[in-house]
Amino acid sequence: MNGARESNAALLAALVGGVADCACDVAVCPPFPYLGQVADLLAGSKVTLGAQTLSEHAAGAFTGEVAGAMLAEFGC
């Protein structure tokens, strides 16, 4: 578990600037609590938003996993 709102912003600003002219695909898969922040920081960039711990189940009590429908709301 790594990340904090302030360090996420600094890291993503450097990443987005660093890949602006790169002929490659880049994705960032932050922990679930930071998806909203990271989605906002990546908006309009060529960096794709991904996610961690996608559950194979559509719903239910699966601690630590995230439902696909929940991730879709963030554009993952």
What are these regions (language model features)?
Residues 64, 72-75:
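Non-catalytic positions within long, well-ordered alpha-helices that form the structural scaffold/packing
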Residues 1-66:
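Conserved N-terminal beta1-alpha1 strand-loop-helix module at the mouth
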